[in-house]
């Protein structure tokens, strides 16, 4: 006799485990099925380990540059084995924390692979096979690295992000195919640790989904740190010459090659649906993704999908928010999270963050806008820490004063973007957001200055000469 649950979640990544815990908190009998460590890609092979390595590598670079603060540090070195240990300890601690939260909230944890059968039955394939039944099933099996369909992608020195994390030594040189978030973050890490990094991006600019000015600044900053970037570069393939990877690409109609010890394929991710559906049990899908309605319900009543399995933002925090909303809906409650405003963050140095729409996007939609921009070189905290390169820009509706978007490239941008997410989600105006006093000296003062600039003039900005 199979056990019955109100909610069965397949996958315990940031979408799945959050959906499971929220469902349990709302009084539903809940189970979660996961064949690997809880936390999914984000916790084990993505966000957290990457940011740990960014922190370590940035700290190494800052110590080498400490002379500008009057600090002498000669013969500074790093121990990559210990950096990897620190990364593993960090992820391990968080994984253990998630396991404890599942247990503390009464979520039944099944170890194994979950496969959906007809009638909302789920087979768990682990040490032994068993079935569970569910009133509602939430599919949250996440994604896996996307591999380009070009020659050489199966070579042993051509890696995905999963495999790059497993390297025990820093590559002497690294070619990164793709110029998105994953690419520029790994470029930040390995260039700081001494690798010669080259980025090949097919689009006209790096981080193409971000503001154009941010992309231009990022390319210059990476170049200053020794990272070579080629945009509008179509990669043709990779071959080996001895132990060296040779990557062929076309840029401005000219075929070129670049050599490296390793090649990283970082062109995005695709849904992980391997073994997820038994024959005849799959819902309607398109290009490998589950099609859902505005309540995240698939074509099969009572079967929901969230996160990287569906179209939309492929981000850990988006998946978590969707998991919360689905659980709330199943409990008959109104959603507590506005899913329309998704912050985007890039953990380069300086950090990049955005929310809402850009000025160009607003104009394309026919919206008359006003903008406010503050250059962080005039911010006291930025000068103290010598992180003065960057800016904060806000976009607001010219007629209603409602904030539509914000783009930031500065220290702690990823920590500060939440203020704008809250403002945009609640349709706050520039005037309303200016009501709050900001502490001094903080990076956050830059937000106030950008808002003031949109209203007619920031205090710490030289006014434009009247014509």
List PLM regions with ranges:
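Beta1/beta-strand and adjacent pyrophosphate-binding region of the FAD-binding site
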Residues: 2-13, 170-180
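Glycine-rich flavin
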Residues: 2-5, 21-28, 33-170, 198, ...
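Gly/Ala-rich phosphate-binding loop of Rossmann-like dinucleotide-binding domains
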Residues: 20, 24, 187, 191-192
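Short hydrophobic core segments
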Residues: 8-10, 114, 132-142, 177, ...
């Amino acid at each position: 006799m199979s056990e019955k649950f109100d909610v069965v979640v397949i996958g315990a990544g940031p979408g799945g485990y959050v959906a499971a815990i929220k469902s349990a908190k709302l009084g539903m009998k809940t189970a979660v099925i996961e064949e690997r460590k809880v936390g999914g890609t984000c916790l084990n092979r993505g966000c957290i380990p990457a940011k740990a390595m960014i922190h370590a590598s940035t700290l190494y670079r800052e110590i080498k540059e400490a002379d500008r603060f009057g600090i002498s540090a000669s013969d500074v070195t790093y121990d990559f084995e210990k950096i990897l240990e620190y990364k593993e300890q960090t992820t391990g601690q968080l994984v253990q924390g998630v396991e404890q939260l599942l247990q503390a909230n009464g979520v039944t944890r099944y170890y194994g692979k979950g496969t959906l059968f007809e009638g909302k039955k789920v087979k768990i394939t682990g040490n032994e096979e068993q079935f569970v039944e569910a009133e509602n099933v939430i599919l949250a099996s996440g994604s896996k690295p996307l591999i380009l369909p070009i020659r050489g992608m199966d070579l042993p020195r051509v890696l995905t992000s999963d495999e790059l994390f497993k390297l025990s030594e820093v590559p002497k040189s690294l070619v990164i195919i793709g110029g998105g978030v994953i690419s520029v973050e790994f470029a930040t890490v390995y260039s700081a640790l001494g690798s010669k990094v080259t980025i090949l991006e097919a689009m006209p600019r790096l981080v193409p989904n971000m503001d154009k000015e941010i992309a231009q600044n990022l390319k210059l900053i990476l170049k200053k740190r020794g990272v070579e970037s080629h945009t509008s570069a179509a990669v043709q393939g990779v071959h080996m010459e001895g132990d060296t990877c040779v990557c062929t690409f076309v840029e401005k109609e000219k075929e070129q090659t670049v050599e490296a010890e390793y090649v990283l394929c970082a062109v995005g991710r695709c849904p992980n649906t391997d073994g997820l559906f038994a024959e005849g049990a799959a819902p309607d899908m398109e290009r490998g993704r589950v099609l859902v309605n505005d309540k995240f319900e698939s074509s099969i009543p009572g079967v929901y999908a969230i996160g990287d399995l569906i179209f939309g933002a492929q981000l850990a925090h988006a998946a978590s928010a969707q998991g919360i909303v689905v659980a709330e809906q199943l409990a008959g409650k109104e959603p507590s999270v506005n899913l329309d405003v998704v912050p985007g963050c890039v953990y380069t140095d300086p950090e990049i963050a955005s929310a809402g729409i850009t000025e160009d996007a607003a104009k394309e939609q026919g919206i008359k806008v006003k903008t406010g921009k503050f250059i962080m070189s005039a911010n006291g905290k930025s000068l103290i820490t010598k992180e003065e390169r960057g800016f904060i820009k806000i976009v607001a509706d010219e007629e209603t004063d409602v904030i539509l978007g914000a783009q930031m490239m500065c220290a702690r941008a990823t920590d500060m973007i939440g203020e704008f997410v809250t403002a945009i989600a609640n349709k706050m105006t520039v005037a309303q957001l200016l009501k709050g006093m900001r502490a001094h000296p903080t990076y956050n003062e830059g937000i106030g200055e950008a808002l003031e600039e949109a209203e007619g003039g920031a205090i710490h900005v030289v006014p434009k000469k009247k014509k």
